[in-house]
Amino acid sequence: MTSESTSPPVVPPLHSPKSPVWPTFPFHREGSRVWERGGVPPRDLPSPLPTKRTRTYSATARASAGPVFKGVCKQFSRSQGHGFITPENGSEDIFVHVSDIEGEYVPVEGDEVTYKMCPIPPKNQKFQAVEVVLTQLAPHTPHETWSGQVVGS
């Protein structure tokens, strides 16, 4: 009988100076076979595409059951993923996140909208617009679809 070890051989990690990826915990473990770039990992990675936010059922149900308000888009930045709506009743501007906008167009200043309101956690003292629908596009203003096509002049 031979006395061979039953553990697999130790293989050093692969290194590729051209690899743009620097995996971080939990993906990069000592002895793992990942390609890594020498030096410091990048810190300013672009955020992923915006998607619908996950809210608790109770928060979603409360917002959906609430009244519909009207307002006008004051400002919206697609690159930052948020903007503000001026309520029709003249109260304080309401925050709107890109994930809460329904429909195919990116809002621009002057677009008329309808929306419902949801408290902003953790203190729930301020509100944000949810279920935002563009009801009237601002006249004589080009609009962009979420896919990037420009419509109007």
Swiss-Prot record:
A cellular component term from Gene Ontology for this protein is:
nucleus
Q: Which UniProt keywords apply?
A: Cytoplasm, mRNA processing, Nucleus, Phosphoprotein, RNA-binding
Region Disordered: what ranges?
A: 1-62
Q: Which SMART domains match?
A: CSP
Set out the biological process GO terms recorded for this chain's protein: mRNA processing; regulation of mRNA stability
Where does the source fall among the domains of life?
Eukaryota
What's the name of the protein?
Cold shock domain-containing protein C2
Q: Which residues are recorded with the post-translational modification Phosphoserine?
A: 19
Q: What does this protein do?
A: RNA-binding factor which binds specifically to the very 3'-UTR ends of both histone H1 and H3.3 mRNAs, encompassing the polyadenylation signal. Might play a central role in the negative regulation of histone variant synthesis in the developing brain.
Where does this protein reside within or beyond the cell?
Nucleus; Cytoplasm
Q: Name one Pfam family in it.
A: CSD
Origin species, per record, is Homo sapiens (Human)
Skewed-composition ranges (Basic and acidic residues): 27-36
Name the principal localization, coarsely classed: nucleus
Q: Which residues form the CSD domain?
A: 68-135
Q: Which GO terms describe its molecular function?
A: mRNA 3'-UTR binding; RNA binding
User: Which SUPFAM superfamilies does this one have?
Assistant: Nucleic acid-binding proteins
